[in-house]
């Protein structure tokens, strides 16, 4: 079977970050007395479901450690590897850091798919690592029933510049760096619903590196940052609000969307992860139409950065985004928490 004829998505039951275990189930898995081990140098651990772990070395520098892997979200092996690696490296940028090294995680059904196809996947990962300026320094592989690829990535960050998802403040404006709808478009493609003019759009967005994160972290008025991935905008924004004790107002019409996404939602191109996300976070939302909910809960793979920015830093953030060619979009604001109001209010 050639690399050009292969359809990797046929070999997996899930796709991309839509493979994630639901937040509710994950809470059960991680709940343990042993998880309460306290190391004063561990600045970021499990407590706030942040993008990566951060460890203070005590010399003004902290180490960032993260891992991310999933099953194919696209059919092309090289693109699958590139997307998976870009997605994993993004966690370092979302914490405000600089990646320094990565190792690969590969699960491969060796009785179904050739090693040459696995090599193409790995080459895609290596390409993304080169884009980020790091080496793919090694890894680990197993014989698995479904193809899996990802990275474990190490980064560094000045300790004072660590950006958490839990340090937002009321008064911050919310900005997104990529459009939503990746899960919808990739599902539409799997269902053979995707129009010719929309082919490749999701892949292009997923391959965009969130490299601007380190520069955003240098701006004092950027109070919190996270990347929008498997739990959707609603999930990651809810975690930001819960960690900071604030609430959010979001302008639905302002949210950047991939072309055709609302049409595909009406046609039923909604990934399974959407329902899992709503089951975990839906109680935090106000009333809204089903199609709005399906977009806000859409699992993103290698999605954009979500920034909480104080108004006085808005111009500097926009200028930084322009330097990286990012179409930055304001989607709402954070407000003081008040009883009787939804944590995430959609207008």
UniProtKB/Swiss-Prot annotation:
Pfam families: AIRS (PF00586), AIRS_C (PF02769). GO terms for cellular component: cytoplasm. Mg(2+) binds at residues 51, 91, 227. Keywords: ATP-binding, Kinase, Magnesium, Metal-binding, Nucleotide-binding, Selenium, Transferase. Homodimer. Belongs to the selenophosphate synthase 1 family. Class I subfamily. This is Selenide, water dikinase. It comes from Escherichia coli O6:H1 (strain CFT073 / ATCC 700928 / UPEC). The gene is selD.
């Amino acid at each position: 079977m050639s690399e050009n004829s292969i359809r990797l998505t046929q070999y997996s039951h899930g796709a991309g970050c839509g493979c994630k275990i639901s937040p509710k189930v994950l809470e059960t898995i991680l709940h343990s007395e042993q998880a309460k081990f306290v190391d004063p140098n561990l600045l970021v651990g499990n407590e706030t479901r942040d993008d990566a772990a951060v460890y203070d070395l005590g010399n003004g520098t902290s180490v960032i450690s993260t891992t991310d892997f999933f099953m194919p979200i696209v059919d092309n092996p090289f693109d699958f590897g590139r997307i998976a690696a870009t997605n994993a490296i993004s966690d370092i940028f979302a914490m405000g850091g600089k990646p320094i090294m990565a190792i690969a995680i590969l699960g491969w059904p060796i009785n179904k798919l050739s090693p040459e196809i696995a090599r193409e996947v790995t080459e895609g990962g290596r390409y993304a690592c080169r884009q980020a300026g790091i080496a793919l320094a090694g890894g680990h592989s197993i014989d698995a029933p479904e193809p899996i690829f990802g990275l474990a990535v190490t980064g560094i960050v000045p300790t004072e510049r660590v950006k958490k998802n839990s340090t937002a403040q009321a008064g911050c404006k919310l900005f997104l760096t990529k459009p939503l709808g990746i899960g919808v478009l990739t599902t539409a493609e799997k269902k053979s619903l995707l129009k010719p003019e929309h082919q490749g759009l999701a892949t292009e967005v997923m391959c965009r590196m969130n490299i601007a994160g380190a520069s955003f972290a240098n701006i004092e008025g950027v109070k919190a940052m996270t990347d929008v991935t498997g739990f959707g905008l609603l999930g990651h924004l809810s975690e930001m609000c819960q960690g900071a004790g604030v609430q959010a107002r979001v302008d639905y019409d302002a949210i950047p969307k991939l072309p055709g996404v609302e049409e595909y939602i009406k046609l039923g191109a909604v990934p399974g992860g959407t329902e899992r996300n709503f089951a975990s976070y839906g109680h935090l939302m106000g009333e809204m139409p089903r199609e709005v909910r399906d977009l806000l809960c859409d699992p993103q793979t290698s999605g954009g950065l979500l920034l909480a920015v104080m108004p006085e830093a808005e111009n500097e953030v926009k200028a930084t985004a322009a330097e990286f060619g990012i179409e930055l979009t304001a989607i709402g604001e954070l407000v003081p928490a008040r009883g009787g109001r939804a944590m995430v209010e959609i207008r």
